[in-house]
């Protein structure tokens, strides 16, 4: 399983992670997005979900593990994961 420590800025990645917390926020021009803290079991990262429909249409909630597809950008000198897709995991 891929760990956050192995992912570099500029990478396009698919990984499994726990949503530790997630909050809907708004940009200065009132566009909605979600800020989330994701954990791979060893470390946590900051993620942005610019497409609110990814969260709202699939009933994505904190405290659960999902499969994410993301692009890693650099923002303010740190890695920022921009989530492109979220998939629920069947048991």
Residue ranges and their predicted role:
Residues 1-15:
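OB-fold nucleic-acid-binding modules
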Residues 38-42:
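Acidic/polar residues in short coil/turn loops that connect beta-strands
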Residues 18-20:
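N-terminal basic/disordered segments at the start of proteins
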Residues 22-33, 43-91:
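OB-fold single-stranded nucleic acid-binding module
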């Amino acid at each position: 399983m891929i760990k956050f420590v192995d992912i570099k800025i500029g990478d396009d990645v698919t990984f499994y992670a726990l949503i530790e917390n997630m909050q809907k926020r708004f940009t200065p021009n009132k566009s909605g997005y979600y800020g989330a803290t994701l954990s791979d079991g060893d470390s946590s990262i900051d993620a942005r979900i610019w497409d609110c429909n990814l969260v709202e249409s699939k009933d994505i909630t904190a405290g659960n593990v999902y499969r994410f597809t993301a692009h890693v950008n650099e923002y303010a000198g740190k890695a920022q994961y921009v989530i492109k897709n979220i998939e629920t995991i069947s048991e």
